[in-house]
């Protein structure tokens, strides 16, 4: 019955793979390394906060397992900090989390006079600051939940501003088009923003650069046309960073293609050679 509750306990013993904690009643609690935020660091005698993830009952010897990486821990911290959630005026609809890095949380208000995002963040961030500190500076985006999936995807990709979306609801996939300067915001550092948006909305999100109105479409060639010469997974890796045309690749910095699309230098050089040859003919 303690599963899902937040516990503060004293660090009693530190091992390589887990930490042993003792609560006020002398109960032994385990915080495995896999349930710790990557930057967590504790010393003996310090207090740690975590949520009860499960109780392992082996040989009639129950072990209480704690977690700091669970979305439930983030949810409970918001419930403690935001009275409107505790009172049932605001509900947390969805959480997506990459522990210690970034999280997105979708909230909804049952009282139209209450702004759910503002209530969760607090005046000058007063409510969210404590949660961010507890989670080792995990960046938390709070967004308004909506059952309109297209609008939800748009909000989930913030701070990027979306130009248009083509939905493929049968495949749970969305093609998102953005202005060139918004693409890197949508993807986020290390791809975190788009990954969390996908987790939150449960949709595969493909990001594309919107071709400007002055771009002459027939002068450029979509990457899909090169499937005979370039492996499909390579094309998909490039499209995932918002570039879907040959000129888009040729105009992009080589380092960006290597780093953002996570491709080998040789692979990028081969692609550039193939695409250049197309325009030199």
Indicate where each model-derived feature is located.
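RNA-contacting regions in translation and RNA-metabolism proteins
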Residues: 1-281
């Amino acid at each position: 019955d303690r599963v899902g509750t937040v516990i503060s306990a004293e660090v009693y013993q530190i091992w390589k793979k887990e930490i042993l904690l003792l609560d006020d009643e002398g109960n032994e609690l385990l915080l495995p390394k896999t349930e710790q935020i990557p930057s967590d660091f504790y010393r003996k005698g310090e207090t740690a906060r975590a949520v009860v993830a499960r109780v392992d009952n082996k040989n009639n010897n129950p072990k209480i397992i704690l977690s700091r990486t669970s979305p439930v821990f983030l949810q409970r911290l918001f419930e403690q900090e935001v009275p409107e959630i505790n009172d049932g005026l605001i509900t947390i609809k969805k959480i997506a989390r990459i522990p210690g890095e970034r999280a997105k949380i979708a909230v909804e208000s049952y009282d139209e006079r209450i702004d759910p995002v503002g209530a969760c963040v607090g005046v000058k961030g007063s409510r969210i600051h404590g949660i961010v500190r507890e989670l080792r500076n995990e960046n938390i985006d709070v967004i308004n939940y909506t059952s309109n999936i297209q609008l939800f995807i748009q909000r989930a990709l913030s701070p990027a501003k979306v130009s248009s979306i083509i939905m493929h609801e049968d495949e749970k996939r969305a093609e998102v088009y953005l202005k060139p300067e918004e693409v890197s915001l949508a993807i986020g550092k290390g791809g975190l923003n788009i990954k969390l948006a996908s987790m939150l909305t449960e949709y595969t999100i493909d990001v594309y650069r919107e071709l400007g109105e002055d771009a002459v479409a027939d002068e450029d060639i979509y990457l899909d046309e090169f499937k005979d010469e370039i492996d499909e997974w390579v094309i998909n890796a490039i499209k995932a960073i918002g570039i879907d045309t040959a000129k888009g690749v040729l105009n992009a910095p080589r380092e960006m293609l290597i780093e953002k699309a996570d491709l080998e230098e040789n692979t990028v050089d081969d692609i550039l050679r193939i695409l250049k040859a197309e325009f030199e003919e």
